Structure formats: structure tokens, C-alpha cells
């Protein structure tokens, strides 16, 4: 099983969704992320981190609110935002990093 650090330190573009099961905006992000994944396919990896289960990881990245999205490549944070992001905005934000 890959560890979180192995995944974000890879050369692949990785979008991390820090969420909580009780969070309504997080639930709204789920289908948006599925749609983004269906559009981008293997060009991006999307993983979800439940901050109630993995609080240490959330603390490491100073996650204060959920949902928080972070984009990584080679361990570097390329982009970060909190709150719900619609599909079009998320695709437009990710596009420059896909090359």
C-alpha cells in the first residue's frame, strides 16, 4: 500500500481533498471530483484524506477548514484552496499544471 508521502512525492500530479464525513460542503465536492477525474483520467491522481481519521496528516499541512484541496507534484504544493470549487473552475485551475 502506498503511503500518503509516497503519493505526493511522486512525479504525478496529485490533487488531495481533505474532508470530513460530517461536512456538507465536502459531500458536495465528491461528485465534482469524480467529474474532474472522468475528464482528466490518468493525467491526475485524486485522493481523499479524512481529517478525522488522519488528523496528524491534516495538521502537518495546517488544514483549518474542510474541504481543503491541495495540488502536489514531487512533494511541492502547487496550489491550495478551501471551500467548494465548481467543476469548470477546478478544471481551469488544474489546466496549467497538466503539461
Please tell me what each predicted stretch does.
Residues 12, 19-22, 65:
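Short pre-active-site segment immediately N-terminal to redox-active cysteine/selenocysteine motifs
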Residues 15-16, 46, 69:
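Hydrophobic beta-strand anchors of alpha/beta hydrolase catalytic cores
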Residues 51-58:
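Structural microenvironment flanking redox-active thiols in thiol-disulfide oxidoreductases
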Residues 73-99:
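Non-catalytic, surface beta->alpha helical segment in thiol-disulfide oxidoreductase systems
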